[in-house]
């Protein structure tokens, strides 16, 4: 999995760049879905980064809670609040200290590509926090989500990287399920209920479907209607990084599936779309 999170701020100028999406429905992405993935999937994983890596919390030296709102015209809106070395994301920008507006989903996606430099419409006085804390934090996240081979030789780094990748992919599944045309079609075939994505003896996430709308809960599911269980964290990481195939893992028993086949089948279809967005 490759995810870009190179964010730059410049108080004197702003530059933007965009790429035109082209191709067929099943092999290309749309900018609106990508914006939802980038905000809730990628930047939303900052919550988990701060919880897993002490170096992340050390970057957050603000003594009072400080919140950054991201408002995308025709797209998502969310606020990340930083407090006591941790952070929390919530939908909406009604209560934020710093607001970063984007005129389109394409412009917001450029933020994470490093090709768009945003200018705050509110809270310009907090530019120091953006430069000294937020940007280094996103750089650290990018290091884990786009790891160098040498870094992955460190077992501790590899474990954190895999966990963050799992959380990012799990949230991306819901965004694709709700916004991507092909994903919406697959979600329309999934009955109400919880789908568990678990790692044996380790972490787990829940995909909750209600009225053909999906949300991701970053916690294990006690009573799922369907479940996908990885034998260990390493297998989960290999699958999400595209190093092994799901079918091969199912055949050798490193991934177990149970419950309603229809739910698992359609989630796998959505996961295929996720891999294209995060490639």
Residue positions per predicted region:
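Feature captures hydrophobic
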Residues: 4-9, 15-279
């Amino acid at each position: 999995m490759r995810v870009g999170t190179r964010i730059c701020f410049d108080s004197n100028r702003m530059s933007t760049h965009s790429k035109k999406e082209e191709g067929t429905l099943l092999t290309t992405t749309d900018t609106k879905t990508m914006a939802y993935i980038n905000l809730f999937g990628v930047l939303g994983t900052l919550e988990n980064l701060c919880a897993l890596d002490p170096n992340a919390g050390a970057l957050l030296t603000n003594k009072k809670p400080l919140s950054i709102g991201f408002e995308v015209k025709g797209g998502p809106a969310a606020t990340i609040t930083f407090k006591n070395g941790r952070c929390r994301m919530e939908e909406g920008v009604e209560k934020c200290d710093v607001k970063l507006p984007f005129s389109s989903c394409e412009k917001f996606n450029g933020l994470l590509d490093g090709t768009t430099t945003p200018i705050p419409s509110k809270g310009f006085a907090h530019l120091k926090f953006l430069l000294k804390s937020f940007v280094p934090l996103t750089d650290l996240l990018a290091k884990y989500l786009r790891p160098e081979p040498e870094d992955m030789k460190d077992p501790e780094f590899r474990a954190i990287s895999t966990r963050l990748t799992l959380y990012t992919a799990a949230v991306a599944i819901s965004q694709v399920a709700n916004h991507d045309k092909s994903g919406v079609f697959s979600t329309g075939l999934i009955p109400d209920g919880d789908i568990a994505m678990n790692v044996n003896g380790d972490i787990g996430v829940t995909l909750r479907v209600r009225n053909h709308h999906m949300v991701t809960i970053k916690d294990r599911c006690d009573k799922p209607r369907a479940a996908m269980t990885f034998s260990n964290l390493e297998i989960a990481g290999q699958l999400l990084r595209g190093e092994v195939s799901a079918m091969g893992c199912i055949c050798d028993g490193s991934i177990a599936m149970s419950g309603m086949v229809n739910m698992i089948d359609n989630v796998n279809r959505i996961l295929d779309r996720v891999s294209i967005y995060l490639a």
